[in-house]
Amino acid sequence: MSVIPSSRPVSTLAPDNDFREIHNWTELLHLFNQTFSDCHMELNENTKQVVLFVFYLAIFVVGLVENVLVICVNCRRSGRVGMLNLYILNMAVADLGIILSLPVWMLEVMLEYTWLWGSFSCRFIHYFYLANMYSSIFFLTCLSIDRYVTLTNTSPSWQRHQHRIRRAVCAGVWVLSAIIPLPEVVHIQLLDGSEPMCLFLAPFETYSAWALAVALSATILGFLLPFPLIAVFNILSACRLRRQGQTESRRHCLLMWAYIVVFVICWLPYHVTMLLLTLHTTHIFLHCNLVNFLYFFYEIIDCFSMLHCVANPILYNFLSPSFRGRLLSLVVRYLPKEQARAAGGRASSSSSTQHSIIITKEGSLPLQRICTPTPSETCRPPLCLRTPHLHSAIP
């Protein structure tokens, strides 16, 4: 799933006098096993395999359910409302693609990184994972930017062309994400032997340069460029909402800070670890025990980064009252009539005490929701929004 292969890329770890005697990858891996064994550190590989399997399984089950629900609910809505929903829908598709690749990684872990699925799947599974990983990050970035633009831009030109612009951006993201992994995937090969392994094997003489180039490009495109954009535009959106002083502005501001924090937690450890291991001995020198420690936990950190597939549906969908209402409506459709009537009654009762703003068309003024009060309550006056896009700009 990265430029750090499971067997550890050691062309830069071997001593110079031994390295001159190495002529192919098999000899290099054999030398590495001898060199690495000289660094003693008590780390239980069996425990790590169990932890990885459980972690992968939990992410797979929870992420699969969440993203399928997000896609189902938003597909029903996207034909009628577009708005920022398009980015959320595409991000869920990308996250689902990552989730669907997890069973292969789980089996690979349990087989101690023996690859049993042939040369084609070795490249394709890695390509499929990387393309969806970049897509998810890019759609998250586009969503952060577009949310701020939607909150601040009321020009007629934007109102007329925003649907077309969003569709073009989404298409461009998929194309870009399909191209970016190619330099890495081209050098992913199946190393034959009694226990074949799927590894990043760039040309032997220039392996260090290739590994560094791929690692730097992954960090730049996957973190250093998206993170400032996500942080800046979410902070700007939060400041904009706070100035408006709406009832829900505090909750929305906290959500936007949560978007930033979750992105950092998921991706910063992964990129720092990958860069340290790639730069080791060629540009920096790390102690033997630290290298051993980083290699041991790299796969756990890599797996931990996939938590964004679980966090994204929660942050951008399930915390939204409108999404939960649409999800309940979708569930009610498939319930038996009596249960559906009871669920519908509960949904109606809970929603009658909430005030909401409905956007009938993009760019139109908000209308007051029709309220039918119960004997114990009265209708509250509508909230006045300074922008007609607040409801649609906050998932």
UniProtKB/Swiss-Prot annotation:
- Which keywords are on file for this protein? Cell membrane, Disulfide bond, G-protein coupled receptor, Glycoprotein, Membrane, Phosphoprotein, Receptor, Transducer, Transmembrane, Transmembrane helix
Stored Pfam families:
7tm_1
Tissues in which the UniProt entry reports expression? Expressed in a wide variety of peripheral tissues in the adult rat with prominent expression in lung, testis, adrenal and liver.
Q: Which residues carry this modification: Phosphoserine?
A: 329
CDD domains reported in the protein's UniProt record = 7tmA_GPR182
Listed GO cellular component terms?
plasma membrane
What residue ranges lie in the Cytoplasmic compartment? 76-86, 146-166, 236-254, 317-395
Mapped to this chain, the residue ranges on the Extracellular side of the membrane are: 1-53, 110-123, 190-213, 277-295
- Segments spanning the bilayer are 54-75, 87-109, 124-145, 167-189, 214-235, 255-276, 296-316
Where it sits in the cell: the answer is: Cell membrane
The entry annotates sugar attachment on: 24, 33
Cross-referenced SUPFAM superfamilies: Family A G protein-coupled receptor-like (SSF81321)
Q: Which GO terms describe its molecular function?
A: adrenomedullin receptor activity
Topology of this chain in the membrane? Multi-pass membrane protein
Q: Which GO terms describe its biological process?
A: response to hypoxia
Q: Which domain of life is it from?
A: Eukaryota
What pairs make up the disulfide bonds?
Answer: 122-198
Q: In UniProt terms, what function does this protein have? A: Orphan receptor.
- Family statement: Belongs to the G-protein coupled receptor 1 family.
Name of the featured protein: G-protein coupled receptor 182
Organism annotation: Rattus norvegicus (Rat)
